Amino acid sequence: MPKKIDPLNKKIYGSLTAMLTVSDVKAAAAFYQKAFGFTKRAIMDGPDGKAVHAELTLRGTTLMLGPEIPQMGSRSAKTLGASPASLYLLTEKVDKTVAQAVKLGATAKGPVMDMFWGDRCGTVVDPEGYTWMVATHVAEPTPQEMRKRMKEQMASQGAGQAASAASGS
């Protein structure tokens, strides 16, 4: 009798798995492991010895990596010159994780700061050009507190942007 196959492959994957196109699968996999704590599930090499697929895991989430295939329209954020998507990564120590990512080659896009919805966040762009918002959940504001914090945060950001524009920064 043939083995019954789970069409959703729930033993390995969740409902949604991100797959990033990268310029160098092995280098990207190494960065995500060292910077964000992913674990390597598999890296598959093609006939030429270059990696054609990688699967990394973090707390039950899978991140797949694949190489650019221009003839199929598959290009990395680095090649595009901008991140076509952002990834939101929850970690226990956001400040440490952001600092580690920067040390390994990511670019910080501003300071790590407490956000109105209760997370402390920092944004980095990884060496492949993808934007990662790294966060630690630090508070659970009520909906009323969240609205108040949002207004305050938006007002302070607007004031900061106006000051930057006035100073020519």
Regions found by a protein language model. Name each.
Residues P2-M19, A29-V125, V134-S169:
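Vicinal oxygen chelate
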Residues V22-K26:
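Short acidic-aromatic low-complexity motifs
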